[in-house]
Curated annotation (Swiss-Prot):
Function noted in UniProt: Hydrolyzes ribosome-free peptidyl-tRNAs (with 1 or more amino acids incorporated), which drop off the ribosome during protein synthesis, or as a result of ribosome stalling.
Name of the protein in question: Peptidyl-tRNA hydrolase
Protein origin, superkingdom: Bacteria
GO MF term (any one): peptidyl-tRNA hydrolase activity
Name of the gene this protein is made from: pth
Species assigned in the record: Rhodococcus opacus (strain B4)
Amino acid sequence: MSEDTALVVGLGNPGPQYEKTRHNVGFMVAGVLSARMGGKFSAHKKSGAEIVQGRLEGRPTILAKPRSFMNLSGSAVAGLARFFSVDPGNIVVIHDELDLDFGTIRLKQGGGEGGHNGLRSISQSLGTKDYLRTRVGIGRPPGRMDPASYVLKPFSSVERKELDLVCEESADAVELVLRLGLEAAQNRLH
């Protein structure tokens, strides 16, 4: 990818009651990336997000966590993109993915939102679906459990044992796409 500024957004819900839920895996990966950047999140009042500014893979990067609930995260993402003059093609959104087994990581650009209301909000606010996504698999709910309830539950004890590694590998995938671009990163990862 180019030296243009990248906007990397981890999706999640604010508040301690959501901190360890499946829906917040994007926030968890953003935490790993902020440590790698050597920065701490601070409020960016004009966008309604917390950000870290620095470099990832030598590239200028704005790392963000919207402070709104996930379903309303689009306004923060669009606000940051405008404020920092970041084109949608240089935005990477990290999110939970029901349609991937727990721990599976996939990169893609554009496409549908797959029922993910955070992605829908971002697509509507940006006016395009053409941004990069780092999809972190959380698996399907067991039995007849409602997916909306499932994503707001904490990871299982078995999953928690693997969660740190999954977050590290997801952060690696973000760095890979920033360094190599989507196609080369997909070839390495998938």
